[in-house]
């Protein structure tokens, strides 16, 4: 079923360029994390919980600027979640997956439900990352990564909310 996507849980983000001031080192350490953000968050709480907000198929017309980061596809799986650390909202996550990426062994991605995306991705053994872009939404930091599972792309955008340990801890 294709959803008529009216709005995202993510507010509009401003992606940084080389002309923007440098990102503070402690923040950059979090945003440039190459491993599982879920695992990193687990170092700062006793309980990680995912609250799915939207899980559905969408068309390319719903991608907006994300379309430039993904190949043409008949449809895309969209997953938007709130990641909670000890019952505090820490992160808004938006994952867009071309239908072709779901073929073969990755169809489990559409049934993650309350399972953190990182638990699936980083247990696959076939994960690579093409890039990380850093962005802002007011005082909040964000990042966008194009990842590949067995060479097939998916796009992950994460907005770190005010209660996130990114703002309250030194790099750990």
UniProtKB/Swiss-Prot annotation:
GO terms for biological process: pyruvate biosynthetic process; ubiquinone biosynthetic process. Keywords: Cytoplasm, Lyase, Pyruvate, Ubiquinone biosynthesis. It comes from the Bacteria. It catalyses: chorismate = 4-hydroxybenzoate + pyruvate. It is found in: Cytoplasm. The keyword Acetylation does not apply. Pathway: Cofactor biosynthesis; ubiquinone biosynthesis. InterPro entries: Chorismate--pyruvate_lyase, Chorismate_lyase_/UTRA_dom_sf. Its EC number is 4.1.3.40. Substrate binds at residues 37, 79, 117, 158. Belongs to the UbiC family. Removes the pyruvyl group from chorismate, with concomitant aromatization of the ring, to provide 4-hydroxybenzoate (4HB) for the ubiquinone pathway. This is Probable chorismate pyruvate-lyase. It comes from Bartonella quintana (strain Toulouse).
